[in-house]
Amino acid sequence: NELEQKVINVGADVGFATDPDGDRLSIVSNKGNAIGEEYTLVLAVKNYLNYQKSIVATNLSTSMMLESIANETIRTKIGEAHVVQKMNELNIPIGGEGNGGVILKEVHLGRDSLVAISMILSLLSSSGKSISDEISNIPQYLRIKDKILIDDKIDFDSLETIFDCNEINKIDGIKFIWPNKWIHIRKSNTEPIIRIFAEAKNQDEVNELINTLKNYLK
């Protein structure tokens, strides 16, 4: 797109794009590639942890890349308000969501793209590395978002036997967790659908998670 091309044309170290209300940030690398909103929080947290040890608060569907950076991650229901509530409850200084939202408590308790930009620029300045180099040192995962029509009466407790996993989290729908993959299933608040989020090391693993769930719900 236009920003990707502009980064290449001017030889920029990084490109930033915010949403209209300035609470979410996307990044374009020095190679002119949009790297995905999931990296915004991960890179901001990496910078913060260079200076101060901290727990990090985020929602259930944020990438497990965060666990590779942070010593401890607290997961919440999806939604900025739930992340902020947990930050207040446990006095956690930094948090956010995988949609490009970074929350730094010392500034204010809300997602802020300018905070994210400043933290990522600080990371690049202190490390002397490019954005491309920084993300190459972070474990890579493939993510898929999907949805399926459902019966409103579906019982989430009945879904627990679909997968043989290491951990199940039921604070917001149901999430099945393994060391290097997960699938999160939750009802939409506005539509008769289940929203599905899945992440794994490769396409085959992600597809297997999604297909297993869909076949069970047929």
Regions found by a protein language model. Name each.
Residues L3-V7, V45, V83:
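Generic hydrophobic alpha-helical segments
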Residues N1-V28:
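N-terminal small/polar loop signature for handling phosphorylated ligands or for N-terminal nucleophile
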Residues D19-P20, S29-K31, W178-N180, N189:
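Short acidic-glycine loop/turn motifs at beta-strand connectors
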Residues P20, K31-G32, T40, S61, ...:
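Short, ordered loop/turn segments at secondary-structure junctions
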Residues N50-K218:
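Phosphate-binding and adjacent anionic-ligand microenvironments
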Residues A34-Y51, K77:
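Short, acidic/small-residue loops that bind anionic groups at enzyme active sites
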Residues R24-V42, L66-E67:
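Short Gly/Thr/Asp-enriched flexible loops that form oxyanion-binding sites at enzyme active sites
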Residues D19-P20, A34-L41, H108-D112:
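Short glycine/threonine-rich catalytic loop with a Thr-x-Gly-x-Asp
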